UniProtKB/Swiss-Prot annotation:
GO function terms (MF aspect): ATP binding; histidine-tRNA ligase activity
One example of a Gene Ontology biological process annotation: histidyl-tRNA aminoacylation
Broad enzyme group: ligase
Coiled coil feature spans: none
Subunit structure: Homodimer.
InterPro entries: aa-tRNA-synth_II, aa-tRNA-synth_II/BPL/LPL, Anticodon-bd_dom_sf, His-tRNA-ligase, HisRS-like_core, HisRS/HisZ
UniProt superkingdom: Bacteria
Disulfide pairings: none
Lineage, uppermost ranks: Bacteria, Pseudomonadati, Pseudomonadota, Alphaproteobacteria, Sphingomonadales
Protein's name according to its UniProt entry: Histidine--tRNA ligase
Reaction catalyzed: tRNA(His) + L-histidine + ATP = L-histidyl-tRNA(His) + AMP + diphosphate + H(+)
UniProt keyword annotations, A-Z: Aminoacyl-tRNA synthetase, ATP-binding, Cytoplasm, Ligase, Nucleotide-binding, Protein biosynthesis
Length: 419
């Protein structure tokens, strides 16, 4: 048997200290904001049948062909650790009778899994927050989700003092007919330049031509710049839909910029596509993204159902939030005489029940315990000691932040008598 300590798996992380506080701050802020917008909390399985993702994401996408953690269970069924939330939520909408709640607003957060190259802010086990509106085909649903995302980022403090730090980039993919006409025009255009495109784009030309538009390869840039734009193919209905989204954002005071090359490669995406981007994280600049996916339910065997949603990586948001120190302890209860240990336990328990964060210092040298408590930096210290053979208490308020605690501390002193 090996005596070597197993090392962490590449692409995973042990989150602790200020990083854990920043992570928790993102989740807590998301939970508070989703309640303001009346999104219902859902919890989804960490693994699903592989077909849930292969049918929703597409067999030829990189996520399905290269990045999914798939395995056979003991019954021989192919299962996959979830690489994203939307497909599982869509499956539940169809299998669990959630249609009765349409339009349904749901939100969740948790770990996801993709086998990709780890880099700054990107892991093989990573975490996302996610919000979806299912069963609402009106532009107002898109507006609500975008306004919610904008408020979330502002309440996280991202870009609060630097308005240019995060930008909402917005595009329309049109309705089904508009998208197909645009796709055909792109195929014709790129085929004329196929030999000069990158290898990835040559491959995408037949499988997923819209994805050529967001290629980062310098060889593709001259051709993507002059490629046909969706605006030339939009139906009147699609133009009206996008106009209502942008006017809704303007009314809500959400700044946005048009990004005509912003696309979603899968055929079930329609109308609105969006990303909140930043230059604060290097080349990987998207911090929150989403769009309308009106054709997804049909891909999973359900009836046509309009839907729109977004997701954001918690790790990346936490990086933008910056380090968050742990909150200061309200009161440290110091037991300066071992005979008063049970009294110390009584006091620290009482404070916690009253909603006051408290720590007990009752070990080590009795003479050094008070100094130890001072170094811990709490707002106040309650010390218990024996004086002339009798229990006695005293408290020390470290700063104005502890003023509200005086009543509880004075009650403790009154019980034992002042030192």
């Amino acid at each position: 048997m090996s005596t070597q300590t197993p090392q962490p798996i590449r692409g995973t992380q042990d989150i602790f200290g200020p990083d854990a506080e920043a992570f928790a701050f993102v989740v807590e802020t998301f939970e508070r904001v989703r309640k303001l917008y009346r999104f219902r909390r859902v919890e989804m399985p960490v693994f699903e049948k592989t077909a849930v993702f292969s049918r929703s994401l597409g067999e030829t996408t990189d996520v399905v062909s290269k990045e999914m953690y798939s395995f056979e269970d003991r019954g021989g069924e192919s299962l996959t650790l979830r690489p994203e939330f939307t497909a599982g939520i869509a499956r539940a909408y169809l299998t669990d009778g959630w249609q009765q709640y349409a339009p349904l607003k749901v939100a969740t957060h948790g770990p996801l899994f993709r086998y990709e190259r780890p880099q700054k802010g990107r892991y093989r086990q990573f975490h996302q927050i996610d919000a979806e509106i299912i069963g609402a085909g009106e532009p107002q649903a898109d507006v609500e989700l975008l306004v919610m995302a904008d408020q979330l980022l502002k309440e996280l403090g991202i870009g609060a003092n630097d308005p240019g730090a995060v930008t909402l980039q917005l595009n329309t993919l049109g309705d089904g007919a508009s998208r197909e006409a645009w796709r055909a025009a792109l195929v014709e255009y790129f085929r004329a330049h196929k030999a000069e495109l990158s290898e990835d784009s040559q491959d995408r030309l037949e499988r997923n031509p819209l994805r050529i538009l967001d290629s980062k390869d310098p060889r593709d840039k001259p051709f993507t710049a002059d490629a046909p734009r969706i605006d030339d193919f939009l139906s009147a209905e699609a133009q009206d839909f996008f106009g209502k989204v942008t006017s809704g954002l303007d009314a809500a005071g959400v700044e946005w910029t048009r990004a005509p090359a912003l696309v979603r490669g899968l055929d079930y995406y329609r109308h609105t596509a969006f990303e909140f981007v930043t230059d604060r994280l290097g080349a990987q600049g998207t911090v929150l993204g989403g769009g309308r996916y009106d054709g997804l339910m049909e891909a999973l065997g359900g009836a046509a159902t309009p839907a729109v949603g977004w997701a954001a990586g918690i790790e990346r948001l936490a990086m933008l939030v910056g380090e968050k120190g742990e909150a200061r302890t309200d009161v440290i209860v110091v037991v300066e005489d071992d005979a008063l240990l049970t009294s110390g336990i009584e006091q620290v328990s009482r404070l916690r029940r009253e909603g006051v964060s408290a720590e007990l210092v009752a070990s080590g040298s009795a003479r050094k315990r008070f100094d130890k408590a001072v170094k811990m930096g709490a707002k106040a210290i309650l010390a218990l000691a024996m004086r002339d053979g009798q229990p006695a208490a005293r408290f020390r308020v470290e700063d104005d932040a502890a003023t509200a605690l005086r009543g509880q501390l004075e009650a403790a002193v009154a019980k034992y008598g002042a030192q």
